[in-house]
Amino acid sequence: RNAFRGDGKIFYKRKLPDDSMDIAIAILNDESGSMSSKQRITYARSASIILYDFCRSLNIPIAVYGHTECYDVDLFAYAEFDSVDGNDKFRMMDMSARDGNRDGAALRFVAERLMTRPEPCKLLFIISDGQPAGSGGYFGTAAEADLRGIKAEYERKGITLFAAAIGDDKPNIKRIYGDGFIDISDLSKLPTTLGKILIAKINQKYAA
């Protein structure tokens, strides 16, 4: 089968296995207000749709979520693993820059959803432009420590986390996510970069 480029076209040809991939994917999008800058939310939306299409074409279970916070954490389920109504991509078009971002609660929710999948390889992609900034003092070192703890907890449970940093807050995101940090300086390369990571994981699985 063919893998995709950032514009949705094929970026290289590679024969991929036709049987079950034993991989499940979840994407968590930051929908904080700062995502309106430099069309970040547009690129995040595009990357989510392209990855969604690619996974569906290979029968890889995928779920896509967004999150923000305005007093309470708001989570948006754009595509669920078992979604059958055919409207996932229409829902993803509603992805928007909104308010704050209390990342810990959202990340834990999506990780728990991913844990319900039977596939042994579980990948969670986070697309964000900055460090957490929520109400009730959820920011700075305390929030960073919370996220590092959540990352470590779910990696022990078998989830591999990647954080695509698409804003100016890259050092902080790298400090939080460590080896899962992905530096996206060119927003147009976001879909391609995430796609290549997914392809590498597929190839790694079948080379084992």
Report residues per predicted region.
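Acidic, glycine-rich A-domain
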Residues: 1-208
